[in-house]
Swiss-Prot record:
GO annotation terms (biological process): malate metabolic process; tricarboxylic acid cycle
Function recorded in the entry: Catalyzes the reversible oxidation of malate to oxaloacetate.
Protein name as it appears in the record: Malate dehydrogenase
Enzyme Commission number(s): 1.1.1.37
DNA damage among keywords: no
Active site: H189 (proton acceptor)
Alphabetized UniProt keyword annotations: NAD, Oxidoreductase, Tricarboxylic acid cycle
Catalytic reactions on record: (S)-malate + NAD(+) = oxaloacetate + NADH + H(+)
Positions with a binding annotation for NAD(+): G11, A12, A13, G14, Q15, I16, G17, N107, Q114, V131, G132, N133
Chain residues that bind substrate: R94, R100, N133, R164
Family according to the record: Belongs to the LDH/MDH superfamily. MDH type 2 family.
Single annotated GO MF: L-malate dehydrogenase (NAD+) activity
Length: 328
């Protein structure tokens, strides 16, 4: 049996956490031969800690052969101690009447503290995925608060947007998602992200050629993917939790185990490619191998795409400037 991997999860008793933990413990994220130790963080309030205890009881009752241990805590330094993987799910949700800038600042406090705790106690090779919104900027804040860790190990989740885009293309073409490759979602995990199927194929054939309808792309496809989260809240009465958890598992599984040459979308610190300023955490197409990701370089960007990329970058720059004073 392999040595256990320590997986820290914040917001562990929340909706996404509840949809996530059982799948991690069953081996869906890291493989059916990889034991895990779950290190679970929740807020230091009685209700959250009680809920966390209940989730841990359920995890025990599943008798997962791969679950080698569990810790439940309200202390980030306990949760992140020697963590190999950290899933930062917990974030302050936007309350009624709350301005976006207030939400940014509230989350900046959380992710500054969590970045500092990771910097202090996590494995030096910890892989960090930020799920809690605004995910790209929260990941940027955590990265900047952890100067001793590798910047490239801080990532934001755009896989949900990627998967949503795949499902829309599947419905349009009447083809299964399994045969689709080379989709990319550029930018911020927000309604400004740009799902781009110019290079994508279905069973080896060009999706752009098959659809051949730029009006559908601009007026139906892009807005549908961008507003899908809001549509789910409207239909379900609460936000997309199971699909977000699924995307987190996809993101980490591909990062750790490799994408076998397939493109996947990850929010990663820019190296200056595609005119995105260095360090901005931005959705790019990547391939993954041996626990590392590599940007897909030199893709042509047409005028239509550039307009969308500029728009999502402008939003990220605005978010970044809104928290700059907190990062020194």
């Amino acid at each position: 049996m392999k040595a256990p991997v320590r997986v820290a999860v914040t917001g562990a008793a929340g909706q996404i956490g509840y949809a996530l933990l059982f799948r991690i413990a069953s081996g869906e994220m890291l493989g059916k031969d990889q034991p895990v130790i779950l290190q679970l963080l929740e807020l230091p309030v009685d209700k959250a800690q009680a809920a966390l205890k209940g989730v841990m009881m359920e995890l025990e009752d599943c008798a997962f052969p791969l679950l080698a241990g569990m810790v439940g805590t309200d202390d980030a330094e306990v949760a992140f101690k020697d963590a190999d993987i950290a899933l930062l799910v917990g974030a302050r949700p936007r309350g009624p009447g709350m301005e976006r800038k207030d939400l940014l600042l509230e989350n900046a406090k959380i992710f500054t503290a969590q970045g500092a705790a990771l910097n202090k106690v996590a494995s030096r090779d910890v892989k960090v995925l930020v799920v809690g919104n605004p995910a790209n900027t929260n990941a940027y804040i955590a990265m900047k608060s952890a100067p001793d860790l590798k910047p490239e190990n801080f990532t934001a989740m755009l896989r949900l947007d990627h998967n949503r885009a795949l499902s829309q293309l599947s419905a349009k073409l009447g083809k299964p998602v399994g045969g689709m490759e080379k989709l990319v979602v550029w930018g911020n995990h927000s309604p400004t992200m740009y799902p781009d199927y110019r290079f994508a194929t279905a069973d080896g054939a060009s999706i752009a050629d098959a659809i051949n309808d730029q009006e559908w792309n601009a007026n139906t496809f892009i807005p549908t993917v961008g507003k899908r989260g809001a549509a789910i809240i409207e239909a379900r009465g609460s936000s997309s939790a199971a699909s977000a958890a699924n995307a987190a598992i996809d993101h980490v599984r591909d990062w750790v185990l490799g994408s076998n040459g397939k493109w996947v979308t990850m929010g990663v610190p820019s190296d200056g490619s595609y005119g995105i300023p260095e360090g901005v955490i931005f959705g790019f197409a990547v391939t993954t191998e041996n626990g590392k990701y590599t940007l897909v370089k030199d893709l042509p960007v047409d005028d239509f795409s550039q307009k969308y990329i500029d728009k999502t970058l402008a939003e990220l720059e605005e978010e970044r400037s809104g928290v700059a004073h907190l990062l020194g």
